[in-house]
Amino acid sequence: MRVLITNDDGPLSDQFSPYIRPFIQHIKRNYPEWKITVCVPHVQKSWVGKAHLAGKNLTAQFIYSKVDAEDNTFWGPFIQPQIRSENSKLPYVLNAEIPKDTIEWILIDGTPASCANIGLHLLSNEPFDLVLSGPNVGRNTSAAYITSSGTVGGAMESVITGNTKAIAISWAYFNGLKNVSPLLMEKASKRSLDVIKHLVKNWDPKTDLYSINIPLVESLSDDTKVYYAPIWENRWIPIFNGPHINLENSFAEIEDGNESSSISFNWAPKFGAHKDSIHYMDEYKDRTVLTDAEVIESEMISVTPMKATFKGVNHLLGELKLTEEENNLSKTNNLIVVSIDPMEYIYKPLTHALKKYLPQVEIVSNLPEFDNGGCEKEMKVFHYGDYEQLDMDKLMELPNNYFTNSYIYRKALIRKHFLSHTIQTYTAKNPESILKKAYLESFTIDLDYAEFLDDALDENWELRQELENESQDKWWIVKPSMSDKGQGIRVFKTIEDLQAIFDSFDDEDSEAEESGNDDDADDVNGEFMDNNKVNISQLRHFIIQEYLTNPLLLASMDNRKFHIRCYVVCRGDLQVFVYDRMLALFAAKPFVPLDPYAYSVTDLKDLECHLTNTCLQSKKKDKDSSVLEFDSIEEIPNERKSNIKEQIHSITNDVFLAAVNVNRLNFQPLPNAFETYGVDFLIDSNYEVKLLEINAFPDFKQTGKDLKNLIDELFDDTVKYCVTPIFNENRNKTDDETDPNFVKVIDYTSNGW
């Protein structure tokens, strides 16, 4: 790996830059495969941020130090390199007095950002893989320090003008004691590199650069905890004092640069005088999240993922009209109703986004009484609630006043047997559709009781033929059409297997009725929860689908089968958006190929490795390892991930067009509603995507606590593009370009609204 190292404290120095030599020496000793280039300011350039000295031509000097030096002595400076460096663009002379294994320091009379820029573009014939900026003498935590930091500025320059990954490193000393022992600097170097290695290996795709802070405390060790931490949004006070008046002759002109008698303002920062910004984010005040400043004060290591940008305020876009028009929202009786339980997983992401984009609109928890006659013409009410809480009469009668988060009719997609019929009808008319290969062969049967299975198969002779064809090595999966959370799913091969499955359902129902206990069949060890029993007579509709026997398996995840959960948002009639931050949900156990001689269709232990629904995994086990963000899976190459997402976009496009065109009775998108669906996909060993099912009101809490930010961003985008235009029609004109993770795949009008 080729690494460029810069800083803002300058070259090795007891007074100004005591940390960089031990840090580089540690890299040289422990990572000899790293090809490092050191390019730093020729003197200390702290507090300059990402500045350049515009108009100034910069020059270079070169100094050299021993790899095993115990002090900050060096050879030089020289006006050109004294040793030959691999892939260097610079001319050199061979100086016999300087050993070949010395550390070369390239000193530029500019800023850290200039050093990064020159280093990336003008020093080497080979590109760099990483830029390390630091270690800074002192912490770089909080908005006040980070925005001023030359260390962070050098890293940011690497991203903006070099498109190179960068990490800013800062070593935080305490009680003003910046000179610490060599042993402590060695520990700080090791721990810094531990964090750097992890970040490089697990680089977040949405992150441009990282800022890490290492506490210089005697307790620093391999056990010192590391925390992702947001920047403390603080505010400071003046960092100068004065004016100081020393005017011996107020009429004198400045000569020879002597300004000692002028009015002066002296550098005098008060490092303890900080306070919270008024914009300090609410979620950081609940004390469940420590800021970078709090982490380092707790003598732990902070890691702050950053974008190389001065963050804009996303909800203020477009033309600024200095008229009363922009205040109209606050002069109406517009209302937002959020009737879901405040303890629900999605309540905070939803209300946070609503307050962010629609601060003028009041949020209440109950829908007020109003009707078509009593509703003001300009009044608009957006109601977010469970399906049963929404007023479907108002949704139909007041299309200009009442808006909801759900359509009324969408069985064509969310009921498995309806979905199968929708796709089969559409592909019959459109054989070139991706759905032809992306939806596994499926059949539907209606069954009241297990003993009527033979009659049901007589009515579906194509299915009977498939099941009786012993020459085929197909396996099948049976699912109740109207169940969710994995209830009633079983894998089988023959008609006898299917009969045994339905008989077991009836047996379980009978036993539960006799015992009065629905939990009798649960696994006593809690490893796999048999909460997926069903009552045949209550569900009646079943889908039988070809089982994918060659799923993509990942060695890094113990070869456990997984499916992708993708959130799809439909707006009006009809725009469809795919949220590209997808989840991968893994089965509890490693995948075991199906063996007709070993597999028991009624033994839930055999089923455990085939079902990826985390709802079926024991509450006694930690489920964190079963849910990952899809983009974080390193074993799948990036080009494969991109292709998988492209397939998902195409499948989503076709399945929603299918519903709106061939099954309009059962999918009726409305102009005054939107809806979020959880769409599940499988990937086979050839990286081909298969559509599993579409869920209305998906179980967002499967995402878990660690990936909550994924849901936060989803609701931010949903409110921005689906709710804000309800109250501000101007947003309809400016939303042609959505956020990169919120991809529009359909823009279609089916009813002329």
Swiss-Prot record:
Keywords: Cytoplasm, Ligase, Magnesium, Potassium. Its main location: cytoplasm. GO terms for biological process: protein modification process. Its cofactor is Mg(2+); K(+). Pfam families: SurE, TTL. InterPro entries: ATP_grasp_subdomain_1, SurE-like_Pase/nucleotidase, SurE-like_sf, TTL, TTL/TTLL_fam. It comes from the Eukaryota. Residues 343-734 form the TTL domain. Its EC number is 6.3.2.25. GO terms for molecular function: ATP binding; hydrolase activity; tubulin-tyrosine ligase activity. Belongs to the tubulin--tyrosine ligase family. Probable P-body-associated tubulin--tyrosine ligase. This is Probable tubulin--tyrosine ligase PBY1. It comes from Saccharomyces cerevisiae (strain ATCC 204508 / S288c).
